[in-house]
Amino acid sequence: MLLDLAKSRRTVRKFKSESFPVDKIIRCIEVAREAPSGINKQPWYFLIVKDPEKKREIRRRCEKFERDLHRRVRGELKEWMERENITWRKDFLEEAPYLVMIFSDIRAPYSRESTWLAVGYFLLALEEEGLSSLTYTPPPAREIAEVVNAPRYYRLETILPVGYPKEGGRKKRRKELQEIMDFDSF
Protein backbone atom coordinates (compact mmCIF):
# COMPACT_ATOMS: atom_id res chain seq x y z
CA MET A 1 0.00 0.00 0.00
CA LEU A 2 1.20 3.51 -0.79
CA LEU A 3 0.89 4.74 2.80
CA ASP A 4 3.11 1.89 4.00
CA LEU A 5 5.77 2.84 1.43
CA ALA A 6 5.62 6.47 2.51
CA LYS A 7 5.89 5.52 6.18
CA SER A 8 8.89 3.25 5.64
CA ARG A 9 10.86 5.64 3.40
CA ARG A 10 13.69 7.47 5.14
CA THR A 11 16.69 9.55 4.20
CA VAL A 12 19.99 7.66 4.03
CA ARG A 13 23.46 9.26 3.89
CA LYS A 14 25.65 6.14 4.14
CA PHE A 15 25.53 3.52 1.41
CA LYS A 16 26.92 0.05 0.82
CA SER A 17 29.20 -0.15 -2.20
CA GLU A 18 27.18 -3.16 -3.37
CA SER A 19 25.98 -2.70 -6.92
CA PHE A 20 22.59 -3.66 -8.32
CA PRO A 21 21.01 -3.76 -11.78
CA VAL A 22 20.39 -0.28 -13.18
CA ASP A 23 17.00 -1.63 -14.33
CA LYS A 24 15.76 -0.96 -10.79
CA ILE A 25 16.41 2.76 -11.27
CA ILE A 26 14.91 2.71 -14.75
CA ARG A 27 11.69 1.21 -13.32
CA CYS A 28 11.61 4.06 -10.80
CA ILE A 29 11.96 6.60 -13.61
CA GLU A 30 9.05 4.84 -15.34
CA VAL A 31 6.97 5.61 -12.24
CA ALA A 32 8.23 9.20 -12.01
CA ARG A 33 7.30 9.99 -15.60
CA GLU A 34 3.66 9.35 -14.68
CA ALA A 35 3.65 12.36 -12.34
CA PRO A 36 1.33 15.26 -13.19
CA SER A 37 2.90 18.37 -14.69
CA GLY A 38 1.85 21.91 -15.54
CA ILE A 39 0.27 22.01 -19.00
CA ASN A 40 1.47 18.39 -19.39
CA LYS A 41 4.95 19.62 -20.35
CA GLN A 42 6.72 16.85 -18.39
CA PRO A 43 9.80 19.10 -17.99
CA TRP A 44 11.96 16.64 -16.05
CA TYR A 45 15.12 14.91 -17.13
CA PHE A 46 16.80 12.07 -15.22
CA LEU A 47 20.52 11.48 -15.68
CA ILE A 48 22.01 8.34 -14.13
CA VAL A 49 25.69 8.72 -13.22
CA LYS A 50 27.78 5.62 -12.52
CA ASP A 51 31.21 6.78 -13.76
CA PRO A 52 33.51 7.06 -10.69
CA GLU A 53 35.45 10.00 -12.17
CA LYS A 54 32.28 12.01 -12.77
CA LYS A 55 31.00 11.18 -9.30
CA ARG A 56 34.34 12.30 -7.82
CA GLU A 57 34.25 15.60 -9.71
CA ILE A 58 30.63 16.23 -8.72
CA ARG A 59 31.59 15.62 -5.10
CA ARG A 60 34.65 17.88 -5.33
CA ARG A 61 32.62 20.77 -6.71
CA CYS A 62 29.80 20.30 -4.21
CA GLU A 63 32.15 20.12 -1.23
CA LYS A 64 33.98 23.26 -2.31
CA PHE A 65 30.77 25.26 -2.02
CA GLU A 66 29.49 23.38 1.04
CA ARG A 67 32.71 24.12 2.94
CA ASP A 68 32.25 27.86 2.34
CA LEU A 69 28.57 27.67 3.26
CA HIS A 70 29.28 25.87 6.55
CA ARG A 71 31.85 28.52 7.51
CA ARG A 72 29.26 31.28 7.07
CA VAL A 73 26.29 29.62 8.80
CA ARG A 74 25.41 31.03 12.22
CA GLY A 75 22.77 30.82 14.92
CA GLU A 76 19.91 28.33 14.96
CA LEU A 77 20.76 26.89 11.55
CA LYS A 78 24.34 26.14 12.64
CA GLU A 79 23.10 24.54 15.87
CA TRP A 80 20.60 22.41 13.94
CA MET A 81 23.24 21.28 11.43
CA GLU A 82 25.59 20.28 14.25
CA ARG A 83 22.82 18.45 16.09
CA GLU A 84 21.87 16.55 12.92
CA ASN A 85 25.54 15.87 12.10
CA ILE A 86 25.26 17.60 8.72
CA THR A 87 28.73 18.57 7.56
CA TRP A 88 30.25 19.98 4.40
CA ARG A 89 31.55 16.51 3.50
CA LYS A 90 29.36 14.71 0.97
CA ASP A 91 30.78 11.17 0.98
CA PHE A 92 27.49 9.81 -0.33
CA LEU A 93 28.19 11.39 -3.73
CA GLU A 94 30.90 8.77 -4.26
CA GLU A 95 29.79 5.95 -1.96
CA ALA A 96 26.42 5.29 -3.58
CA PRO A 97 26.65 3.05 -6.66
CA TYR A 98 24.58 5.53 -8.69
CA LEU A 99 23.74 9.21 -8.64
CA VAL A 100 20.49 10.26 -10.25
CA MET A 101 20.64 13.91 -11.26
CA ILE A 102 17.20 15.36 -11.85
CA PHE A 103 16.84 18.45 -14.01
CA SER A 104 13.93 20.70 -14.94
CA ASP A 105 13.58 22.28 -18.37
CA ILE A 106 13.33 26.00 -17.62
CA ARG A 107 11.63 26.63 -20.98
CA ALA A 108 8.47 24.95 -19.67
CA PRO A 109 5.99 26.76 -17.44
CA TYR A 110 5.79 25.37 -13.90
CA SER A 111 8.95 23.36 -14.57
CA ARG A 112 10.29 23.42 -11.03
CA GLU A 113 6.98 22.50 -9.38
CA SER A 114 6.30 19.76 -11.92
CA THR A 115 9.77 18.25 -11.60
CA TRP A 116 9.50 18.05 -7.83
CA LEU A 117 6.23 16.13 -8.20
CA ALA A 118 8.16 13.60 -10.30
CA VAL A 119 10.89 13.49 -7.64
CA GLY A 120 8.26 12.50 -5.06
CA TYR A 121 7.03 9.67 -7.28
CA PHE A 122 10.63 8.58 -7.86
CA LEU A 123 11.44 8.46 -4.14
CA LEU A 124 8.46 6.21 -3.39
CA ALA A 125 9.36 3.96 -6.31
CA LEU A 126 12.90 3.61 -4.91
CA GLU A 127 11.40 2.50 -1.61
CA GLU A 128 9.31 -0.11 -3.41
CA GLU A 129 12.49 -1.40 -5.11
CA GLY A 130 14.22 -1.72 -1.73
CA LEU A 131 16.62 1.14 -2.49
CA SER A 132 17.46 4.20 -0.43
CA SER A 133 18.38 7.79 -1.18
CA LEU A 134 18.37 11.37 -0.01
CA THR A 135 17.42 14.56 -1.79
CA TYR A 136 20.60 16.60 -1.99
CA THR A 137 20.16 20.05 -3.48
CA PRO A 138 23.62 21.24 -4.47
CA PRO A 139 24.35 24.95 -4.01
CA PRO A 140 26.28 25.57 -7.25
CA ALA A 141 23.75 23.83 -9.51
CA ARG A 142 25.10 25.23 -12.80
CA GLU A 143 28.71 24.36 -11.99
CA ILE A 144 27.68 20.81 -11.10
CA ALA A 145 25.54 20.47 -14.23
CA GLU A 146 28.61 21.31 -16.33
CA VAL A 147 30.28 18.06 -15.22
CA VAL A 148 27.68 16.12 -17.22
CA ASN A 149 27.40 18.65 -20.08
CA ALA A 150 23.80 19.56 -19.28
CA PRO A 151 22.29 22.10 -21.69
CA ARG A 152 21.88 25.58 -20.20
CA TYR A 153 18.10 25.33 -20.31
CA TYR A 154 18.19 22.42 -17.86
CA ARG A 155 18.32 23.47 -14.19
CA LEU A 156 19.71 20.90 -11.77
CA GLU A 157 17.08 20.47 -9.07
CA THR A 158 18.53 17.64 -7.01
CA ILE A 159 21.07 14.86 -6.91
CA LEU A 160 19.85 11.57 -5.48
CA PRO A 161 22.54 9.08 -4.46
CA VAL A 162 20.89 5.66 -4.82
CA GLY A 163 21.86 2.38 -3.21
CA TYR A 164 21.38 0.03 -0.30
CA PRO A 165 21.72 1.59 3.15
CA LYS A 166 24.96 0.82 4.99
CA GLU A 167 23.32 0.81 8.38
CA GLY A 168 19.90 0.53 9.88
CA GLY A 169 18.20 3.61 11.07
CA ARG A 170 14.93 5.04 12.10
CA LYS A 171 12.67 7.41 10.32
CA LYS A 172 12.46 10.75 12.05
CA ARG A 173 9.27 11.85 13.72
CA ARG A 174 6.57 13.13 11.42
CA LYS A 175 4.13 15.83 12.46
CA GLU A 176 0.70 14.64 13.51
CA LEU A 177 -2.07 15.03 10.96
CA GLN A 178 -3.85 17.71 13.01
CA GLU A 179 -0.64 19.80 12.89
CA ILE A 180 -0.61 20.00 9.09
CA MET A 181 -4.24 20.26 7.98
CA ASP A 182 -7.59 21.90 8.58
CA PHE A 183 -10.93 22.41 6.86
CA ASP A 184 -12.11 25.64 5.24
CA SER A 185 -9.77 27.97 7.13
CA PHE A 186 -6.62 28.05 9.26
Question: What are these language model-derived features?
Answer:
Residues 5, 96-103:
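Short, basic/glycine-rich phosphate-binding loops at helix/coil junctions
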Residues 32, 100, 105-147, 160:
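Small-aliphatic-rich amphipathic alpha-helix that forms the alpha element of a beta-alpha
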Residues 1-94:
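N-terminal amphipathic, basic helical "cap/leader" segment at the start of enzyme domains
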Residues 4-12, 83-87, 92, 158-186:
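C-terminal helix-cap and adjacent tail motif
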Residues 43-44, 96-99, 156-157:
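Short, surface-exposed beta-edge/turn micro-motifs
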Residues 65, 101, 148-163:
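Short, conserved aromatic-histidine micro-motifs
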Residues 38, 127-128, 152-153:
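Arginine/glycine-rich "motif VI" loop of SF2 helicases in the C-terminal RecA-like domain
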